[in-house]
Amino acid sequence: MEFTLTEERNPLTSDIDTLPTRDMLTLINAEDQKVALAVRGELPNIAVAVDAITDRMQRGGRLVYIGAGTSGRLGMLDASECPPTFGTPPGLVVGLIAGGSAALTEAVEGAEDDWQSGRRQIAELDVNENDSVIGIAASGRTPYAIGGLEEAKKRGALTISIACNRPSSLEGRAEIGIAPVVGPEVVSGSTRLKAGTAQKMVLNMISTAVMIRLGKTYSNLMVDVQPTNIKLRHRARRIVAEATGLDLQRATGILAACNGEVKTAIVAILAGVSPEIARIRLLETGGYVRKAIG
């Protein structure tokens, strides 16, 4: 079995069970501070991944996450946040987890060791050369994620790995490897800690940067937000007001006239056109608000 730093004992926390609570938390916090630095070291690789994913998604491709345990749950979480945040259609960003939906809330014994299951799920998605598949595994050796990347590569998809060990078997199957090496965990082998935090940070970066590149924001405003609840409806009104400089009452009225479409309202206001013309401009510019304003 290959060496994995994430499974090693952390010499700095060997006495953690003897510490007062405040000292214990201080030690955990000190270890957590290493995570952002490890992620920063991988920014060049993350940037390459973002640009490559964006290129494929502009050709109609999907973004697929595949992983087991904590890694799989993090992928599922990131995928599930894209529709309400960026207005992506269901199926554009997909999360696959070993053991299926049951594994979101409880351990499914042996699921992560099922190499064939990873391959099968990628095949069932009919992954193709326009898609991007990210295998996530703290150890970098999870058979389920490795099988998924192997099948994706066979089908011509872009393959990316996120692991917290280097080198790793997972990275060996990927075109682009991202490996924030965070070192041994506070509790040996508990990769839901630093490794999980690092993976979440990388996934946040990838999905956010890709969506910005796809025109899902205007400035730093989430203009493709889907106002599906009271909080998001209030947010949509504030976004229109902040983007255009109008007071909240006027912005709310124009947003209503645009059927709640934030992008349409912003373009209509800033370009001085009707909602119908604003929609046409957005269609012609691929949904990029700045281009539609002209």
Map each language-model feature to its residues.
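Short, amphipathic alpha-helical interaction segments embedded in low-complexity terminal/linker regions
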Residues: 210-294
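Residues at the C-terminal ends
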Residues: 58-59, 154
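Cofactor-/ligand-binding subdomain signature composed of acidic, glycine-rich
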Residues: 1-38, 42
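A short, well-structured juxtamembrane/interface segment
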Residues: 41-56
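Glycine-rich phosphate-binding loops that contact phosphosugars or nucleotide phosphates
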Residues: 64-201, 208-214
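Gly-rich Lys/Arg/Thr-decorated short loops/hinges at beta-loop-alpha junctions or inter-strand turns
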Residues: 27-35, 95-106, 218, 259
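EF-Ts-like protein-protein interaction surfaces
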Residues: 187-203, 226-239
